[in-house]
Swiss-Prot record:
Glycosylation sites: N377
Subcellular location: Endoplasmic reticulum membrane
Any matching Pfam family: ERO1
Subunit structure of this chain's protein: May function both as a monomer and a homodimer.
Keywords: Disulfide bond, Electron transport, Endoplasmic reticulum, FAD, Flavoprotein, Glycoprotein, Membrane, Oxidoreductase, Redox-active center, Signal, Transport
Assigned protein family: Belongs to the EROs family.
InterPro entries, sorted: Ero1, ERO1-like_sf
UniProt name for this protein: Endoplasmic reticulum oxidoreductin-1
EC number: 1.8.4.-
Cofactor: FAD
Repeat recorded as keyword: no
Annotated disulfide bonds: C28-C41, C30-C39, C79-C384, C88-C93, C209-C230, C387-C390
Record function comment: Oxidoreductase involved in disulfide bond formation in the endoplasmic reticulum. Efficiently reoxidizes pdi-1, the enzyme catalyzing protein disulfide formation, in order to allow pdi-1 to sustain additional rounds of disulfide formation. Following pdi reoxidation, passes its electrons to molecular oxygen via FAD, leading to the production of reactive oxygen species (ROS) in the cell.
Amino acid sequence: MREPLLQLIVLSLIIIVVNTQFESGRLCFCKGFEAVEPCDCSKPQTIDKLNNHRIYEKVQKLLKKDFFRFYKVNMDKTCPFWADDRQCGTNQCGIAFCDDEVPAGLRRRNAVNMEAAAVKEEEDDDAEKCADAGNNIDPMDRTLHDDEKRQLDAMDHHDDGLEDKFCEIEDDESDGMHYVDLSKNPERYTGYAGKSPQRVWKSIYEENCFKPDPKFDKNFLTNPSNFGMCLEKRVFYRLISGLHSAITISIAAYNYKPPPPSLGQFGSQMGTWFRNTEMFAGRFGTKWSWEGPQRLRNVYFIYLLELRALLKAAPYLQNELFYTGNDVEDAETRKAVEDLLEEIRAYPNHFDESEMFTGVESHARALREEFRSHFVNISRIMDCVECDKCRLWGKVQTHGMGTALKILFSDLPHSHYKQDSSKFQLTRNEVVALLQSFGRYSSSILEVDNFREDMYPGESVMNTAADGPPRKSNKIDL
């Protein structure tokens, strides 16, 4: 009798604590004893102020550079877990996918010597075919200019240090690998909904071998919780929840309202992009679930984890040339990287990876390997996403998170690496994915502040920032 009563008391306390997380005075987040805790926005060390005042503008400036804009990816890999015909549930979430539209300089090496006239003819034909297909709301842009092709041919390089991978690694020279300009394909609403994304997220949460109840059911997917887990299991859960939540924030921040049906298919009015505060409040508030604010905390947790990975990789990044063939821009990129690292170094409250995978060596190694292998599977699940743009960003973000985990955990004492193995190697694609992933979480935290101002006027941390990014209106012009 005492045990159920104790559990009820603990649950009640949890609900009370969580319900205070969105009350005035506790709207921001700070580094806590283990991870992230709600705190007063007036505190100087809030993660919100770090990001919105000091980090956000610098990382966005960096991601506009050629070295970081282009990501090499195979968008045609088969889903390894179930049959997938890549047909979206609506005609709004599909996008045009035309391999031959990719410029000759970025195709596989045996196609580079094709005659320019033939290539141009193929590209024109494919572009015409693509014009009538795919996502009507936000199609994926695969175009590259000639000077961009030449730079990318020179800037792509890779290494052999892939033994400790935390995500599915694609061979840069394999068939199907093509460059995508991420600046032309921002993460936002695409209309992708229904059974397909539900199946993907169900599989991702099922891949979480650390869930409290070994028998997975829909209640865990609806209201997942890390209550009762050890540190490593809580970290794994937070990675999944934080990824899910960051994607939801992007969709809510860049949501789409279609034109009135009365206009018909010949109507000239376009739909409206807007910030969907109601969607944000429903997902991250406490109206429907006490778990809402916890989901936000997991976004901040991944932000701190990737911030720590960037700090740990700082010596490597400082020696990187970030070569694109444009000497002026390459120098600007190196300066932008150093400016970002300087801000990261100044922050005192970083994630501490040394607390993980400790104890008996054999158990720690087994737990670390289980952690690694299950995260690899999550990265593979991204090939099962039917919406191309959603799949692209799913692959980028899991690749970036996997790179962060590789940096943080590959040189721990119980790793299969030697104790003094501090000179890890990264591919160009890993560096791009890590910064792009960090950029997504940085943007999410800024958007949280925009939503915070909508829901609690005057509580935004940006109200006190004279040099921060301008606040967005509820209606978004793209």
